[in-house]
């Protein structure tokens, strides 16, 4: 039997029992397991980890532990390069894309409202979600911790909140996306890009009273849905402005 001293930082502490949060603790193990296996045995999915230091040196997930080491584990720095340290994903994302688990439809719509490319469908099983995430380099958003422990996944985030309003704030904070908000540039229904369209082109495609009242229209390039600044738009605009998109104050 061997032991190792571990310390988890920032939001990774959410996965740990209270007694092990924000402090060093000792963990016992047999053999020479990979550091990834030890970490996930403690409940922390590898997709939320971007840096592991063993005795002050950055290591890969496959690094073997022999006992007596001190291990520090840090969350993903999704938008920042951390070289020359060994980040545990191929490279940080410069444009963050999402795929959302099947029970998170409202979150998907809110992310699209804010301008983020977000794939969502109610018929996607776990295998499909994982494949889309890996192939498209999309961050998989889910409430299922077990899903994030799949070995081929490299990008994922476990949502702490069950409230869609809180969830969208949580995602923006966790991935440092405050400066990337582009409200009303994506279709909330299909995720297509929304562009301005000439008023003359919407004649007959919107109710006569709408055509008479409004001068500016936009159109989804995917599903061709027409948008205008009516009551629905104003309600969504209030929703967008109400999001508390200020930097989260996490402390290790």
Where are these regions (language model features)?
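Surface-exposed, charge/polar-rich loops and edge strands
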Residues: 183, 190, 243-245
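Ubiquitin-like/PB1-type beta-grasp interaction modules and other compact soluble beta-rich domains
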Residues: 1-97
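Long, charged N-terminal interaction/targeting segments
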Residues: 61, 70-182
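Residues immediately within or flanking Cys/His clusters that coordinate Zn2+
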Residues: 184, 217
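Helix-rich terminal scaffold detector
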Residues: 96, 212, 247-249
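Short functional micro-motifs and their immediate structural scaffolds
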Residues: 192-198, 228
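Short cysteine-rich clusters marking metal-coordination/redox-active sites
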Residues: 187-190, 220-223
